[in-house]
Amino acid sequence: FFSSRRRHTRLVRSRGLGDVYKRQVYNTNSYETLEALRMLDGLVDIYLPDLKYVSGAVSKKYSGTENYFEYAAPAVQEMFRQTGLLELDGDGLANKGVIIRHLVLPGSVDETRRVLKYIAENFPKNITVSLMSQYVPCYKAEKMPPLDRRLLRREYERAVDYCLSLGLENAFIQKMDSAKREYTPVFDGKCD
């Protein structure tokens, strides 16, 4: 995958198609090896990494692997090394940089606090963070309390308050009504 992406990006840039392909954006769950990410150095303009969990137990419960953070933390650091802080053009469009995304899960505000604390302690205070409230229970989550319900307003507000208390300066905060079916990709048609 990475080698074909590198070839494609180089081909696009060598043929002067920059006006067609303005930015190379890499959307990832961050469960990546450093070796793979280094293959993308200089080819990706904007990274959109998720940072889901710090706790191995939570990671195991929800993603089936205890070592998510062991891969994700250095991966996000590498993405930041490659592209730095988010930079916008005169029209407010992203030119380059990293937006670290975190989806606040129902019943998991303590895990969100651990993730935000890690970000605050390991990145500049003006790193861009997207603190997402758009969780919608789908598929097997419908039978896994507390993931069988939507995020409560008070849970999200606690997460936002903590984010701000850490001094993180550039946080995208969502409205609670973003957790709607029409905003959720349908992978198997089983979302409520």
Residue ranges and their predicted role:
Residues 84-192:
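Auxiliary Fe-S-binding modules of radical SAM enzymes
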Residues 1-21:
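Single conserved hydrophobic/aromatic residue that forms the stacking wall/gate
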Residues 15, 34-40:
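Distinct, well-ordered alpha-helical segments
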Residues 62-63, 70-89:
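Anionic-ligand binding region
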Residues 25-27, 174:
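Structural motif
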Residues 41-55, 128-135:
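Non-cysteine beta-strand/loop elements that form the S-adenosyl-L-methionine
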Residues 30-34, 51-69, 98-100, 105-107, ...:
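Conserved radical SAM core fold
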